[in-house]
Amino acid sequence: YQTSTFMFETVEQGGARFAGTETGYVYSRPANPSTNAVEDKIASLENGEAAMATASGMGAITAMLYCSVVAGDEIVADETLYGCTFAFLSKEITQLGVKVSFINMNNIDALKAALTDKTKVVYFETPCNPTMKVIDIRAVADAVHAFNKDIKVIVDNTFCSPYLQRPLDLGADVVVHSATKYINGHGDVIAGFVVGKPE
């Protein structure tokens, strides 16, 4: 559906949709049948309950992190990250009073030492961009959830894609993607996805 708006059968139907008392499409920014179809496919590929499409991979990453933390919270992230993600975590989100610690996520002792009662998110990519370092998702998720099951383990699965790796099946809580890379495969689309578990 290459449209920004949708028709209604009646004025009353339009009013009900805008009021939120009837489900259906109103405007393509919040929902579009084509976007919903892609979201459903990505969620299925990742064994997730639902997915949200974004305008870019960084849109997916920042949306997920912004809704997961507030001032005073802490994020523990791997030290090897895509440059824009590292810049966001080290320079942008910290301006909102969020503390970010960077560690080698393969060092489980360092991970355990970095976790505090203020930690809300553990974030990493695997394989990492650009070094292709591989991180043991299950080992990280098990260590984090043993400390506090409410901490979100967020994995950027851009470089593996769900064809080779499904982080939710390995204990992660949320998966993010830059669809520009392997999901699209051609470098001619800019998009991102956030995929979550049933809970």
Protein language model features and the residues they cover:
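Residue-level marker of positions within ordered structural domains that often coincide
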Residues: 7, 47, 197
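Conserved PLP-enzyme active-site core in the AAT-like
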Residues: 51-199
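A broad "ordered helical/assembly scaffold" signature
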Residues: 9-10, 126
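Short conserved active-site loop signatures built around small residues
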Residues: 1, 37, 194
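Conserved N-terminal alpha-helix of the aminotransferase class I/II PLP-enzyme fold
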Residues: 10-59, 84-92
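C-terminal substrate-binding/catalytic lobe of Rossmann-fold NAD(P)-dependent oxidoreductases
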Residues: 1-5, 12
